[in-house]
Amino acid sequence: MNYEKLHSKYKNSSIQGRYLNLNSIESFSEFWKTKNKLEILGLSVQARPIYKFQIGSGTTKILMWSQMHGNESTTTKGLVDFMNVLQSNSEIAKAILKEYTFCIIPMLNPDGAFSYKRVNANEVDLNRDFQNLSQPESQILMQ
């Protein structure tokens, strides 16, 4: 398997730079919705939607999320590329989707992404909020 060819084939080149906010991924939402299950799980502190994309029919369920820290967008870019692979109808994608069901939250902290900050709009680091679950974003992730 040639990973460089796979990367160049499925990489979303429209997402560039370090600053990635909700508008960047919402442009793909209609495409995701038409091919698979896309839903809004809830809203952030500043009422921005938190999306979940679901694909696959396998018995093993995998939860993936990105941008828990709003200013860390690298994984979001990787998830978008991975979602492109899963929707490609390739033999690899078919085999993966037969075994697994993926639930993907491409941006957990859209308020932090908007302001390019690690924390959410209430100045809470969501990665430190798993015990208290004081923030709507943390509560959404734990549903």
Model region roles, listed by residue range:
Residues 14-18, 69, 127-131:
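Second-shell loop/turn segments in exported
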Residues 59-63, 73-143:
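Active-site/substrate-binding loop(s) of hydrolase catalytic cores
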